[in-house]
Every structure is written in C-alpha cells, then in structure tokens.
A protein has these predicted regions:
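Juxtamembrane helix-loop-helix connectors linking adjacent transmembrane helices
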Residues: 1-57, 223-233
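Transmembrane helix-loop-helix hairpins at the membrane interface
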Residues: 39-224, 229
Length: 233
C-alpha cells in the first residue's frame, strides 16, 4: 500500500510540474461518480469487482505467467509497465505500474493470483469509495466559497478525510515495507529462469517483440490523446 500510494503522489507531482513548466493543461479521466445512489453503486461494483477480476486474469494470470519464463524480475517490470499504460491516463501511469509490479511480485512468491486479486480489490474499493465521496461535491461552488472565505457544507470534511486516508495508508504501508525489507530480506529474492542472459538483454528482447511494440504504441497513443483532450480517435 505504501509504495502504491507514494507512487501516486510522485506521479501527481511530476505531471503538475510538467504542466506548470510547459504552460499546458493536461486533461485527466474523471473517476468521480455521478453523485446519485445508482451511480455510486455502479462505480463501486465496476471498479472494485469487475475491473480487478478481469485485469488479474489478463495481466497476472496470463501475461505474467508467460513473461516470468524469462525471469521473474523481468516479468514483474514489463507486466507492471504494461499495466500502467493499459489505464490510458497520465494520472495513473506510475500508480498503476507500481501496483502492477507489486501484484506480479505477490503472484511470483505465492504461485497464485488470489493474493494479487485481493490487493487489487482492496485498492480499487478504496478508490471507488473516494470517487463516490468526491462525486458528491460541487467543486465549482466549493471553489467560489473558498475564494470568498465563506466555506459551508461538508465538502471540506470530505476532502480532508479522503486526503488523510490516502496519506495514512501511504505512511503505514511504507513503514511496514521498510520493516519487512530489513528483517526478511530473503523473502524478496526472485527466481531467474534464464541466468545465462543478462537482465538488460531480457528487457530489450521483450520490448522489441512485434506484439509488445504494437501494444505499447497503441496504449501510448491513447494516453497522449486523452491527456490532450482529443478523445480516442
């Protein structure tokens, strides 16, 4: 959790700096719900149940199982990067890539996709709840009240609660990660199924495969067009 949430903050910082330095305004994907009860339920079900199930079968159950034959570390890195691009949003590239790598690591160590499915389900459920909470806020009204210094309603409490939840999970997760790394370093060892081939060469082979080139090109194309507000086509 710590690494995943930390990557989200880093991703936000990087692209905020890029926009400020370049004078551009990137368009993000709106993850908030419609604010209605039906919209909230639909958002939670889609994000916390359907998406994790489909994506874990596709990325960890299929893609990683094939990629790890070149070495578990190679598989973790490459499938993680692919997972980041798969989301088609600059807001989620680093966040999703790190989560994808963590999920692949769990599969590599346990031999099952169920731990990664639980991780994915948990992360998406938290995100869906945050989405529903933020979707209930009229941000135009909130911005106007903030400018006048006359803030009313529950918007401030909701925003603070969402921020504290994310920040708290990040700090707690990072502390536990450092503790685990310090006292159980051997548990982080990965299997190299092709010791005669260097790690760099494995990554190059993966990235230069025709299927990988086409997939990455398509995903990058979608991500860039979405960020520029041009739509998919």
């Amino acid at each position: 959790f710590g690494l995943i949430y930390a990557s989200n903050y880093i991703n936000t910082f990087i692209f905020s700096y890029v926009q400020k330095a370049s004078g551009t305004s990137l368009k993000g994907v709106d993850f908030t719900s419609s604010g209605t009860a039906l919209g909230g339920v639909t958002s939670v079900l889609a994000m916390s149940v359907l998406a994790p199930f489909f994506e874990e079968l596709m990325f960890r159950g299929t893609l990683f199982r094939n990629a790890e034959k070149c070495g578990q570390l190679t598989g973790i890195i490459m499938v993680g990067l692919t997972f980041g691009l798969w989301h088609g949003s600059y807001q989620q590239i680093l966040y999703a890539a790190v989560m994808g790598m963590c999920a692949c690591f769990m599969v590599a160590k346990t031999g099952s996709i169920f731990p990664s499915l639980i991780l994915h389900f948990t992360m998406n459920t938290i995100g869906a709840i945050q989405s529903v909470a933020l979707g209930s806020i009229d941000f135009d009204k909130f911005a106007a009240e903030l400018e006048k210094g006359q803030i009313t309603g529950t918007a401030p409490m909701i925003i603070i609660a969402v921020a504290l939840l994310s920040f708290g999970l990040m700090i707690a997760g990072l502390v536990l990660f450092v503790k685990e790394l310090r006292y159980h370093r051997d548990s982080f060892r990965l299997i190299n199924f092709c010791p005669d081939v260097s790690q760099g060469k494995k990554i190059v082979i993966y990235l230069t495969a025709p299927v990988t080139i086409l997939a990455f090109a398509g995903l990058i194309f979608i991500t860039v067009r979405t960020a520029l507000g041009l739509g998919l086509f």
